[in-house]
Amino acid sequence: MATVGFLGTGLLGSGMVERMLRRGDAVTVWNRTASKARALEPLGARVAATPGDAVAGAEHVHMTLPDDAVVDEMLEKVRPQLRTDAIIIDHSTTSPAGTKKRVPRLNGAGIKFIHAPVFMSPQMARDGVGLVLVSGPRAIYEDVRSELEKMTGEVWYVGEEPDRSAAYKIFGNSMLFVIAAGVSDVFAMAKGLGIPAADALAVFSKFQPGGVIKARGEKMARGDFSATFELTMARKDMRLMLEAAGSQPTVVLPSIAKRMDDAIAKGHGQDDLGAIAAEVVR
């Protein structure tokens, strides 16, 4: 049974704590909005009055906090109460730059700290599935590996570079946002054409474009723009999309159209659609 301090019991943090409690860990929680921490009390969590009280005596301290500033604030508050052998596991989505400074600064001061952001929903956290990304000192990772494996379906150690997991996390989130924006634009086209949104989604029960990330993405990363879908033809299709949407608000299509126009003006018209990335991969 692990002795755990947990800072930040919002939606994701609460899911993680529930999982820990079900497996028998002793968990002390703190949250700035105290009612969110107290909601875990009936499940067996001990609620601390201060962040320092939450970490006192804990072998492992987990954090799911909003941003870099709050992470740094909490770390300063809890330092005096940390056990000398405690390991801090930060699941917060933080900036690569902030994480790159934070990890060596704390480790250099004798505080064991590792960054481990996640790709999981609150329900996935409760169920112990999803992906945990970890970067930082290998020795610290090995010390917490078994605990992380109990929390999730997969743990991916991405290397010693302290900011790598933070970078990969925002890469993944960016794709989630692009997908949400793309779905919104599909609905805009559907509304402009008088097609119900639910019917528009039926296309993606047959056509699943996720494979493009690997197939076209690998070529783009190599700077290989040999055409399988010429950019000029893709731009024609973009015109059809914008015409279909009409006066309906679109999120990403106009920006993509502009990027296509810029790439065509620079001589990429006969290259592949992936040439919209030419400036960032060459």
Range-by-range predicted roles:
Residues 51-112:
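Rossmann-fold NAD(P) dinucleotide-binding segment
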Residues 16-17, 36, 102, 147, ...:
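Hydrophobic residues within alpha-helices
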Residues 27, 47, 113-114, 155, ...:
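Hydrophobic beta-strand scaffold residues
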Residues 1-63:
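NAD(P)+-binding Rossmann beta1-loop-alpha1 motif at the extreme N-terminus of oxidoreductases
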Residues 162-280:
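Helical "substrate-binding/catalytic lid" subdomain
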Residues 15, 53, 60, 66, ...:
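Amphipathic alpha-helical hairpins
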Residues 4, 94-177:
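Rossmann-fold dinucleotide-binding core
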